C-alpha cells in the first residue's frame, strides 16, 4: 500500500493526500499573517492582498473548505464506519488499506482518474457507491476491470487494444462485446 504514515488515523491519512489544497491553505495563512503585520506597521499590502485573493480562489476551486467533509463522504462510501475514522491505518488489513489508498486518490480529484481493477476488495455496497461516484465525476476516467457489470454502469466509451492498435467504441462495455 502507499500509506504515508501507518500510525496516523485513516481520516488524517486521506486528508494528507490533498497536498495542493493543504499548500494553498498554509500559504493563505502565511499571507494573512504578513498582511496583518505589515498593515499594523502602515506598510503597503496591495501585492500581498492580490496574491492572497488568488490563493483563496484556488483553495476554494480545489474544494479546500469541503476537504474534511469530502474525505468523510469518500471513506463512508467505501465502507468505513464513522468510528473507524480515528483508528490508525495500521489496524486495518491489506484490503481495507487498499480502500484507504483509493480514498486518497478519489479525494485528490485528478483531471484524469486511472483505476486498475477498482472493485477488488470492495463489497457490493462500496462498488455501488463507487459507480455513483464515477458517474458524477467531472474529469476523465480510465478503468481497467474484469467486472463487466461495473464497466457497464460506469463507461460510455471503450478503448480496445488489439494487435498494437487502439480502437474506440461509443457505448457500454456490453455493447462493445
Provide a role label for each language-model segment:
Residues 1-177:
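ABC ATP-binding cassette signature C-motif
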